[in-house]
């Protein structure tokens, strides 16, 4: 595994630090008036989700880990476990539903997601950035209410509540960004 300097850490990098695997969530490069420059890095443990703030000087060496990414197709859920099938080998694997966190409701039957592995252990899963959902409940459209840039609450077919523009009505399909959990556009 390659070692990188502390000032080369970027958001999204996976590092081996303090005996665990950590994902760099946020990186701030700081150059104080006195003393050497350093990177203030917010890390998230890939195994248990705990967070840690660390300071890395430019001279510090950190082990960067490359994760293997595989496409997995969602099949079904059983006892809090999500069952996926590898798109290439047709091998089935079970992953805990907590791996997706608050994005879990956006997982749909047959959807292909990217799962990141390290030594055959699934550490992270990412949904497609945009997903089509149906609005099942929202306030009716009121004419003339488009003057201000306002939004109204809507409940989607998966139970998630998002804010939508006033022109979106009930039973309409919309596109939702799964990373921010916000309305993107009409489908």
Curated annotation (Swiss-Prot):
CDD domains given in the database record: S1_EF-P_repeat_1, S1_EF-P_repeat_2
Protein biosynthesis is among the record's keywords: yes
Localization terms from the record: Cytoplasm
Gene Ontology MF terms in the entry: translation elongation factor activity
GO aspect biological process, one term: peptide biosynthetic process
Pathway(s) this gene product operates in, as recorded in its UniProt entry: Protein biosynthesis; polypeptide chain elongation
Main location: cytoplasm
Membrane spanning residue stretches: none
Keywords for the protein's UniProt record, in alphabetical order: Cytoplasm, Elongation factor, Protein biosynthesis
GO CC term, one of those recorded: cytoplasm
InterPro entries noted in UniProt: Elong-fact-P_C (IPR015365), NA-bd_OB-fold (IPR012340), Rib_uL2_dom2 (IPR014722), Transl_elong_fac_P/YeiP (IPR020599), Transl_elong_KOW-like (IPR013185), Transl_elong_P/YeiP_cen (IPR001059), Transl_elong_P/YeiP_CS (IPR013852), Transl_elongation_fac_P (IPR011768)
Free-text function comment from the UniProt entry: Involved in peptide bond synthesis. Stimulates efficient translation and peptide-bond synthesis on native or reconstituted 70S ribosomes in vitro. Probably functions indirectly by altering the affinity of the ribosome for aminoacyl-tRNA, thus increasing their reactivity as acceptors for peptidyl transferase.
Record-linked HAMAP family: EF_P (MF_00141)
Family note: Belongs to the elongation factor P family.
Protein name in UniProt: Elongation factor P
